[in-house]
Amino acid sequence: TACVAIEIDTPGKPFFRQERIGKNGKPIYIFKLRTMVSDAHEHPEKYMTSEQLAQWKREQKVDDDPRITRVGRFLRRTSLDELPQFINVLMGDLSVIGPRPVTLEETYEYGDARDEVLSCKPGITGWWAATDRNDSTWASGQRQARELFYVRHQSVGLDARVFVKTFKAMRKGK
């Protein structure tokens, strides 16, 4: 039903595939339900103001991103857009819990910790995503710190905390 809603809301395929960097720097493709207009990544200037474009270049995030569709807002708020990533788990590219998979450009945001973070299999959710994914940015350094915290403290107990926090965030729509 989500696929039908996406196709009714805006033209284009309901699934989105993007290259990210997996464990040990291996390129992988992650799957998601499309939450933006179809040409959002190819032509962001069609949809964003100059201020929004500057924020995107700085933080890889935009407040009230105009490229996100109505259905996309709901899918993101409930994290339902991430469900297709279980295909990536079955393929062995992702784990359920780990640092979020990032683009090649974003890997450099980790600085000297880049190889350490990439030594861990990325996950559908993780410490950063579960604690404050909507409240921190690369520019603040908080995202890097939270992802590195997970890599350095991996345990069944921490995974359980991430799972519970993720579930609570999904219920609250954060």
Where are these regions (language model features)?
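A hydrophobic, helix-centered structural microdomain
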Residues: 1-42, 88, 156-174
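Alpha-solenoid HEAT/Armadillo repeat architecture
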Residues: 61, 76, 149-150
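Short, glycine-rich, amphipathic interfacial segments at transmembrane boundaries or analogous
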Residues: 16-66, 125-146
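Hydrophobic structural segments characteristic of membrane proteins
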Residues: 5, 83-174
